[in-house]
């Protein structure tokens, strides 16, 4: 079998023998390049090892690779090649079939001739080759004439894809002033065509837009600077268009483009410059510290860190009065007040301000000094200022006994303005609520207005105001601290009430009490007190005093033999004097009780005379008190009497309590031995049931008990017992005032267990039913009316109740 078409012989052709065994491998050196079928004999000669004159033996398939150009656009199916079997004699007895990748969809075969055609457009970039299988069958029997074999159809590339920049558009940055040839960015284009076949995938780069500033390497796609000293301040953004063309850039090649946006980054190549060489500013003399006077600005064409500025005052007479700082957001210099200004002292200042870049690049220092200076003139404007006190604080000491109206200090203030307005003085009354002082409105003399007492207020802190007469809104103030000095105006005295005791068996010279004193004064040299007996007790025979020279004194007995019966209490007057000028003194009394003591001096009992306070009540008050007590007693007795004679309630409140209704009780008792059943009567009147009161005679109806006995048969003891039981229960019901006044039918399903009395239903009368008479039921009242009608005599009309 031989193949014809667009094919080339590989180095090794595989020949498969019939019945699935190999004939071997054949080395072929001849390549079939023709697009037309090769004559059978010529191809067979190529496939044979023997001389052509020899008779060739039967061989299997003869294969090669088929090559088909992609992107066929014709209307007819594309001819690929031809398959032929040695057993095909051209009579149509052989049928060729095709299977494998794309068989019947992409490729078809003429089953008679073996011609292969492509029926779909082929794209090498989607699929480069197809592997198919071919077989020759007997058309009549369908039996394989030769074993199935594989062959390959390769898609031959054409230049149908242009280069593409997969990462575009590009963004790049390069510093300004960069040297020529500085690398900016590398761009890369890819071509989907076969790089191993021709020049379809060979890409060449060129620049379409961006010259003369940039260039591109035709092979690598690296973009570089092509112009020196490119200045960002002149032009910052560049748009460069790069082209990639296949076929090595030859005519007819396909091309693709991309855009590269290049930005020149800033460098510090521009020094700062002040647009103004002179600034004129003004400030009020009352401007507070750190207040803004004005702003200066040095322009720098750079940006970012390269445009940062630092402003300083390098010269001028205002360096000590003003300061300058840099605003980091706007890079301006802010001039502020450094110390208080005074129009009267200095009316103008001159500053020399420098602005410089703190970040420099050495390679650009030759472009000039990266600093500049300007001159600032500042004028101080006059304002109407409040009066100023000199000094700014007053401290005054004054004795507490100073006379009212005494001048203790002269307060002085002046108007700092050129006009020097007149001033009026006053005291801020919120600082002197007690109004102890006042000030002369014209002279500023501070005087006392009330007596001073150091023991009450030892310090006074007041505020004196000074006001311009022409402009009352201009007010100055000064604090004045006044210390009140002490004078000896308080006599010493005992700090508390002293009460001592002396034993009856005390001896002469025995200590019974130590006393001390206090003085509200505060002399500079400290307090010193002197103790002695008062003049009226100077010759006291019982007690004496000894000064300890430490502001205390001892009280001693002068004799022994004290007796409670003779005198139980002694009052000893003591004179206390201070050391001030003038000397002040006071008399304090020491109370001494006489007590019984044991031998060791421990007090056992003190029984001084009872001092009763005189209590005297008038006769009218005493009578009023007794009258109130009597009225209260009468009221109590009256209340008790009324509670004792409270009216008792009636037995029957009203006729409505007697019910004539029929009430049904679905209560089923437990017989005679059911002691836990509830009592209806107790539920009707719980108070009577709880009290356990004896039944009272009903007022509405009394049963005739005596008449019952004549109707009860006496022939049987059992009947007599039952009769007595029924009569007793009937009597209890009639005597119960709170029992329901109506009859009811009770059904008892449970009659108890083992009752010795037996069931009432088993009772039998000694006589027959005809002999029994129930006429007595008519005498039992309304309760037994129904029974009387059922069992009573039928003769005569029924009784009426």
UniProtKB/Swiss-Prot annotation:
It is found in: Cell membrane. Disulfide bonds: none annotated. Residues 61-165, 166-274, 275-389, 390-494, 494-610 form the Cadherin domain. GO terms for molecular function: beta-catenin binding; cadherin binding; calcium ion binding. Expressed in placenta, adult brain, and fetal brain. It is a single-pass type I membrane protein. InterPro entries: Cadherin, Cadherin-like_dom, Cadherin-like_sf, Cadherin_CS, Cadherin_Y-type_LIR, Catenin-bd_sf. Gene3D superfamilies: Cadherins, TCF3-CBD (Catenin binding domain). The chain crosses the membrane at residues 620-640. Residues 60-619 are extracellular. Residues 35-59 form a propeptide. Coiled coil: none annotated. GO terms for biological process: adherens junction organization; calcium-dependent cell-cell adhesion via plasma membrane cell adhesion molecules; cell migration; cell morphogenesis; cell-cell adhesion mediated by cadherin; cell-cell junction assembly; homophilic cell adhesion via plasma membrane adhesion molecules. GO terms for cellular component: adherens junction; catenin complex. Keywords: Calcium, Cell adhesion, Cell membrane, Cleavage on pair of basic residues, Glycoprotein, Membrane, Metal-binding, Repeat, Signal, Transmembrane, Transmembrane helix. Residues 1-34 form the signal peptide. Changing residue 746 to H: In a breast cancer sample; somatic mutation. Residues 641-801 are cytoplasmic. Changing residue 416 to T: In a breast cancer sample; somatic mutation. Glycans are attached at residues 261, 420, 461, 542. Pfam families: CADH_Y-type_LIR (PF01049), Cadherin (PF00028). Cadherins are calcium-dependent cell adhesion proteins. They preferentially interact with themselves in a homophilic manner in connecting cells; cadherins may thus contribute to the sorting of heterogeneous cell types. Three calcium ions are usually bound at the interface of each cadherin domain and rigidify the connections, imparting a strong curvature to the full-length ectodomain. PANTHER family: CADHERIN-20, CADHERIN-23. This is Cadherin-20. The gene is CDH20.
């Amino acid at each position: 079998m031989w193949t014809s078409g667009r094919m080339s012989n590989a180095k090794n052709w595989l020949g498969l023998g019939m019945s699935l065994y190999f004939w071997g491998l054949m080395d072929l050196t001849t390549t079939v390049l023709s697009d037309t079928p090769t004559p059978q004999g010529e191809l067979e000669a190529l496939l044979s090892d023997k001389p052509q004159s020899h008779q060739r033996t039967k061989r299997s398939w003869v294969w090669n690779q088929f090559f088909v150009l992609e992107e066929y656009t014709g209307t007819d199916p594309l001819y690929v090649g031809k398959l032929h079997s040695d057993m095909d004699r051209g009579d149509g007895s052989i049928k060729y079939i095709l299977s494998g990748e794309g068989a019947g969809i992409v490729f078809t075969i003429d089953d008679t001739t073996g011609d292969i055609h492509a029926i779909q457009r082929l794209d090498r970039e989607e699929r480069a080759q197809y592997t198919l299988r071919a077989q020759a069958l007997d058309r009549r029997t369908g039996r394989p004439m030769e074993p199935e074999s594989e062959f390959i159809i390769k898609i031959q590339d054409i230049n149908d894809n242009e280069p593409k920049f997969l990462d575009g558009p590009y963004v790049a940055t390069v510093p300004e002033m960069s040297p020529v040839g500085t690398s900016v960015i590398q761009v890369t284009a890819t071509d989907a065509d076969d790089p191993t076949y021709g020049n379809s995938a060979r890409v060449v780069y060129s620049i379409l837009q961006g010259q003369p500033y940039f260039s591109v390497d035709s092979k690598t796609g690296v973009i570089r600077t092509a112009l020196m000293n490119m200045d960002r301040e002149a032009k910052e953004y560049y748009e460069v268009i790069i082209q990639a063309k296949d076929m090595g850039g030859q005519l007819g090649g396909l091309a693709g483009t991309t855009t590269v946006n290049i930005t020149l980054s800033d460098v510090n190549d521009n020094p700062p410059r002040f647009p103004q060489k002179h600034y004129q500013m003004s400030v009020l003399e009352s401007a507070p510290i750190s207040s803004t006077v004005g702003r200066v600005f040095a322009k720098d064409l750079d940006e970012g860190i390269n445009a940062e500025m630092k402003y300083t005052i390098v010269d001028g007479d205002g360096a000590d009065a003003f300061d300058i700082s840099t605003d980091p957001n706007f890079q301006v210099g802010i001039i502020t007040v450094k110390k208080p200004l005074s129009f009267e002292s200095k009316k103008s200042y001159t500053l020399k301000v420098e602005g410089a870049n703190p970040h420099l690049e050495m390679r650009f220092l030759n472009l000039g000094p990266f600093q500049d200076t300007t001159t600032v003139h500042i004028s101080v404007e006059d304002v109407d200022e409040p009066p100023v006190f000199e000094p700014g604080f007053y401290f005054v000491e004054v004795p507490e006994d100073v006379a009212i109206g005494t001048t203790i200090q002269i307060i002085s203030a002046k108007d700092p303005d050129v006009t020097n307005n007149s001033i009026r003085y006053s005291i801020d009354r919120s600082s002197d609520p007690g109004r102890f002082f006042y000030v002369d409105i014209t002279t500023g003399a501070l005087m006392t207005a009330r007596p001073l007492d150091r023991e009450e207020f030892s310090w006074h802190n007041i505020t004196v105001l000074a006001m311009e007469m022409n402009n009352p809104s201009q007010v100055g103030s000064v604090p004045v601290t006044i210390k009140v000095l002490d004078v000896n105006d308080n006599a010493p005295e005992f700090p508390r009430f002293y009460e001592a005791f002396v034993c009856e068996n005390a001896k002469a010279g025995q200590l019974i009490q130590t006393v001390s004193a206090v003085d509200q004064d505060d002399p500079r040299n400290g307090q010193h007190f002197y103790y002695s007996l008062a003049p009226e007790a100077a010759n006291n025979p019982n007690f004496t005093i000894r000064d300890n020279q430490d502001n205390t004194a001892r009280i001693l007995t002068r004799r022994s033999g004290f007796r409670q019966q003779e005198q139980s209490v002694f009052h000893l007057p003591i004179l206390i004097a201070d050391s001030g000028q003038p000397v002040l003194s006071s008399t304090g009394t020491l109370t001494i009780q006489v007590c019984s003591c044991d031998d060791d001096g421990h007090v056992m009992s003190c029984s001084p005379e009872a001092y009763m306070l005189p209590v005297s009540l008038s006769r009218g008050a005493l009578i009023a008190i007794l009258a109130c007590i009597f009225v209260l007693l009468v009221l109590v007795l009256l209340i008790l009497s009324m509670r004792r004679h409270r009216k008792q309630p009636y037995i029957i409140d009203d006729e409505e309590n007697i019910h004539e209704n029929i009430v049904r009780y679905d209560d089923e008792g437990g017989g005679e031995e059911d002691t836990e059943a509830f009592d209806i009567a107790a539920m009707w009147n719980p108070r009577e049931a709880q009290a356990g009161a004896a039944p009272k005679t009903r007022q509405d109806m009394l049963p005739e008990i005596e008449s019952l006995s004549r109707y009860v048969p006496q022939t049987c003891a059992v009947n007599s017992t039952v009769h007595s039981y029924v009569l007793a229960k009937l009597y209890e019901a009639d005597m119960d005032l709170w029992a329901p006044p109506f009859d009811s039918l009770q059904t008892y399903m449970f009659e108890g267990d083992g009752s010795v009395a037996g069931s009432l239903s088993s009772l039998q009368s000694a006589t027959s039913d005809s002999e029994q008479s129930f006429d007595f039921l008519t005498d039992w009242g309304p309760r037994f009316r129904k029974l009387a009608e059922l069992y009573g005599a039928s003769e005569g009309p029924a009784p009426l109740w």
